[in-house]
């Protein structure tokens, strides 16, 4: 068997992987809700900053410049506050932005747009970073998220199939103030 590259899977393994998502209402404390709101705002801010930088570069050169990483933004003195945010959430912003630019140039979609505070969904996604010492885990009705010390209480209203690995979590704040946590498991 030859070398395998990142993102490349055996056909048998690809068929064997099943993903299942569950969405539960959550009840974060006031402090947790404040942190989650900051993570949502930082994700929107980074998207808008990446888009502005990309558009400026595209106007100047007429070509798509390489997209900066969240770490490069964290190094700027006026953006040092990004260091306190969930790095995996910011990495997901970069991945989504790269996909949007790719779809724009392939003609599948229009040009990426800026995200306004009250006109886009209040959400961010974070991933599992380490299987041995998971930063993201569900224990009964308590969900441990990165950068949040205490677990968030969920209303687990349906049974979660055993044996799955929690891969990511999308945190959403609805306009009525309720919080939802979408958990993606891989079996």
PLM region descriptions:
Residues 1-187:
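Nucleic-acid substrate recognition interfaces
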């Amino acid at each position: 068997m030859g070398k395998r590259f990142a993102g490349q899977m055996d056909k048998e393994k690809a068929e064997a992987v099943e993903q299942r998502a569950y969405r539960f209402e959550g009840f974060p404390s006031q402090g947790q809700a404040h942190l989650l709101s900051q993570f949502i705002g930082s994700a929107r801010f980074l998207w808008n900053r990446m888009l502005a930088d990309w558009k400026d570069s595209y106007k100047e050169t007429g070509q798509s410049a390489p997209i900066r990483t969240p770490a490069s933004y964290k190094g700027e003195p006026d953006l040092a506050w990004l260091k306190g945010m969930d790095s995996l959430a910011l990495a997901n912003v970069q991945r989504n932005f790269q996909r949007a630019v790719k779809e724009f140039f392939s003609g599948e979609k229009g040009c990426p747009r800026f995200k306004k505070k009250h006109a886009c969904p209040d959400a961010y996604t974070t991933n599992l970073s380490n299987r041995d010492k998971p930063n993201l885990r569900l224990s009964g009705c308590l969900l441990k998220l990165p950068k949040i010390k205490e677990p968030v209480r969920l209303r687990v209203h349906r049974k979660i199939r055993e044996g799955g690995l929690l891969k990511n979590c999308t945190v959403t704040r609805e306009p009525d103030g309720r919080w939802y946590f979408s958990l993606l498991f891989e079996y």
